[in-house]
């Protein structure tokens, strides 16, 4: 086919024409979305990423074009020339921006034919197996829903760049090939051909480089950065992800929080015309764990947790008493109107927490005649009213209680609280509840390795008033870290950084880095801190996760153009994949015979 014989440059897109253009001569190009034959006329819905336009092929007015249209099939690419005409009365489509007009086609050229697609591209409502969608991702993206999410992502990135530029931030790219440093997850490693036996690491974040930029005097930095983590995956994680990375000098956490809040407000308004109220709520890490059992609570509904150890200790219920003796935790929450839960429903929730490693779920209903449950007999009358008041129980309510180790109790109640909220439709998907979580512990205890580890990363500054606890009680030290949470998802985290070389050295030593390991992994950074480091702080926001929530998508893969599966594979290009033996020899790498094949 000689494509130069037909001028297929568009005069308009498929979402652009309105009734004001009636009688105009136009050229459109796109994909055949649907074809319909009606009484000799052929109707084609022509699609591009901008929208749909209806084409009309009339055998009397344009017999050649009509004859060619008889051959058209879904997903063929065509170009047409024609006249904009109004649709007949009663035939308009108010659901389409172009629904008042159609194009009477005079000329058509077929630019590209298509095999029959493995699934319908024209209908977003038809459920398609995700593996099939990912294998043919280039077809999946043509579906309107996926394309809209990618457009929203573009709008968000553009809004971020414009806003941060106006705030004096410089967009600076940092290296992709870097050094392997401990940041909490496994690194993706890249072998060096020039230096056999040595490896680069793909960045889990630009953390060290952005701090070096502050030492370099760049003052305010940002980057829409690709990051890589070889970690266990779930619906809101990918091995390759994008974050809005920021760092600034000579500021306070309050300054940075204000900038981030205004940035998010701008993104939501730009992308979805949503007005986000500011300032965001703030809760300490300790309050979050006490009232919600996690450090990323969903605040769109109630059901706060209550510590019941003091009341449980007054009962004769052995399950509670045994846990209290073992330094366990008895906690619960109240479900309004939950007294109508059937025994079957309660058993299902008991099984649910059982899968989280908790053996039982205690419950008490408040009815007109008082408290009702098989365990009420273990509760002395003297604490009934106290339980009712502390749990804010009204007639018709139910409370669920769990007794276990503090970590398991909190985890199970957090998951149960979220599940019940979903089951009872307590979550408004159109409501966005932001939260800053502050005052995290600086350290946590790694039971397996019997040592302290950083709760965030080792560059986070402690609260200066807690420095005296470094040697005596480091687990009580608070960090200057802050996470931002949206609807129960952590969408970002940051901190005030350590800008003093001696303090940074002490933190590394407290984390049990040997002098040799410290010099090998961080010697260059500790040296840089000795050359006049300004106070600085920063944050990284998860772009993929923000777009996932903004577009009300359950799966992060839906907002990434070419995502990996939950097994970190790409079904479309079939990777990871073997490489040629010659490449392995150059890298001096030996690999065992693989039993895996994509075929």
From Swiss-Prot:
- Mind listing the UniProt keywords for this protein, alphabetically? Aminoacyl-tRNA synthetase, ATP-binding, Cytoplasm, Ligase, Nucleotide-binding, Protein biosynthesis
Record-listed L-aspartate binding positions:
183, 229, 456, 497
Q: Does the record's keyword annotation contain Transmembrane helix?
A: no
* UniProt entry tagged with the keyword Ligase: yes
Kindly list the cysteine pairs connected by disulfide bridges.
none
InterPro entries named in the record: Aa-tRNA-synt_II, aa-tRNA-synth_II, aa-tRNA-synth_II/BPL/LPL, Asp-tRNA-ligase_1, Asp-tRNA-ligase_1_N, Asp/Asn-tRNA-synth_IIb, AspRS_core, GAD-like_sf
Q: In which broad location class does this protein mainly occur, judging by the first location in its UniProt entry? A: cytoplasm
Catalysed reaction equations from the record: tRNA(Asx) + L-aspartate + ATP = L-aspartyl-tRNA(Asx) + AMP + diphosphate
A molecular function (GO) term: aspartate-tRNA(Asn) ligase activity
Renumbered to this chain, region (Aspartate) spans 207-210
Q: Which top-rank group of organisms is this from? A: Bacteria
Q: What processes does the entry annotate via GO biological process terms?
A: aspartyl-tRNA aminoacylation
Positions of ATP binding:
229-231, 238, 490, 542-545
**EC number annotated for this UniProt entry:** 6.1.1.23
- Where is the protein localized? Cytoplasm
Which GO terms of the cellular component aspect does the record hold? cytoplasm
Q: Where is this site: Important for tRNA non-discrimination?
A: 38, 90
* The family this protein is said to belong to: Belongs to the class-II aminoacyl-tRNA synthetase family. Type 1 subfamily.
Q: Which NCBIfam families match?
A: aspS_bact, PRK00476.1
What's the subunit arrangement here? Homodimer.
Q: What does this protein do?
A: Aspartyl-tRNA synthetase with relaxed tRNA specificity since it is able to aspartylate not only its cognate tRNA(Asp) but also tRNA(Asn). Reaction proceeds in two steps: L-aspartate is first activated by ATP to form Asp-AMP and then transferred to the acceptor end of tRNA(Asp/Asn).
Name of this protein: Aspartate--tRNA(Asp/Asn) ligase
Instruction: Give the originating organism.
Output: Protochlamydia amoebophila (strain UWE25)
